[in-house]
Amino acid sequence: MVQPYHAPPRASFLQKLGPGGAASLGLAALTVLGLAGLPWAYRLRQVLRGVHGDDLAPADAILVLGRRLEADRPTRVFESRLAHAEALWRRGLASRIFIAGGTTGKARLSEAEAGRDWLVARGVPASVLLLESRSQHTLENLFNVRADLRAAGWRTLLMVSDPLHLARARATARGLDLEVRCSPARDAPPARGSLAWLQRAALEAFLLHWYHTGMVYSRIIGSRQQLERVT
């Protein structure tokens, strides 16, 4: 079996791209430009549709996707994700909480460790929390969590992130054959309809298009390493 590429801790943008990443990024940009923005508009519709969904159901574990830290502390966006995961856990929708996210930027803690400390300070027992602290981005979050999930004999995840991120996270999880339901942290900034919100929606639409372009590109060129990374 070909070992998939994983970015090192505190990876640069080019390191995070990995083998084939720059090519698929270029293809994604070219298809958007060459087709007058239609692929981007289609993905934007998916991103905005995902804002409204809340697919609550009991699961084996709740998964909180990480976010880059500021001064070794969760940002408001990450805090909103964590608080929503805590609320779902207290409602009894799952008995364990996965927190995913490695060491990024200048942080001394991983995103998962900072998330654990935040939840423990709010009274969540440390024994409830499982950490995935090796990843550098959403794809690696889910790839590593999949291995941990299988090792524990679990199947279902209730995935938590901010609303604009969930369409891409859901697509990535399904590409990895994960059985996920999604619940958005609706109070996560930026405020809905603000300029920052619109900019984030536009970016997420392109990132979602890039992900799907990468899947198609990997299959066309028959790259086992690329396919092992995304499926």
Residue ranges and their predicted role:
Residues 1-60, 221, 226-229:
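N-terminal membrane-anchoring alpha-helices
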Residues 194-225:
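C-terminal capping/extension of enzyme domains
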Residues 2-9, 40-201:
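A structural signal for short, hydrophobic/glycine-enriched beta-strand patches
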Residues 178, 229-230:
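Secretory/periplasmic and organellar redox-cofactor proteins
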